[in-house]
């Protein structure tokens, strides 16, 4: 995860269907800000650009929402195609798909 640089947000985000859902909106913006800008190797697997390794627990700690709220937010984002999730035994790779 880069600590510098920027992301571009369009004002049309205001019309996004999840904009009024605080948890889902915060979760999506957090993922946008924390995904890899470049492909990186991590414990023998390649984490692609636009992806990050995390877990529901870790996201819950970072955002100060409950695990259930994080899980529901991820389900919303998966259902509408903004985020994809690949589960492994000890971690999950979240990918921003838009």
Explain the meaning of each model-derived region.
Residues 18, 35-97:
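Winged helix-turn-helix DNA-binding recognition segment
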Residues 27-31:
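Short alpha-helical "packing" element that flanks the helix-turn-helix/winged-helix DNA-binding module
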Residues 21-25:
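Short helix-coil-helix linker/hinge
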Residues 1-20:
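Long, low-complexity, charged/polar intrinsically disordered regions in eukaryotic proteins
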């Amino acid at each position: 995860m880069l600590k510098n640089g920027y992301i571009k947000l369009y004002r049309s985000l205001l019309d996004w269907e999840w904009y009024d859902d605080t948890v889902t909106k915060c979760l999506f913006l957090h993922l946008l800000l924390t995904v890899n800008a470049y492909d990186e190797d991590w414990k023998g697997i390649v984490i692609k650009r636009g992806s990050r390794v995390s877990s529901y627990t870790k996201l819950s700690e970072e955002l100060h929402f409950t695990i259930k709220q994080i899980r529901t937010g991820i389900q919303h984002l998966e259902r509408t195609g903004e985020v994809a999730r690949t589960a492994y035994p000890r971690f999950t790779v979240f990918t921003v798909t838009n």
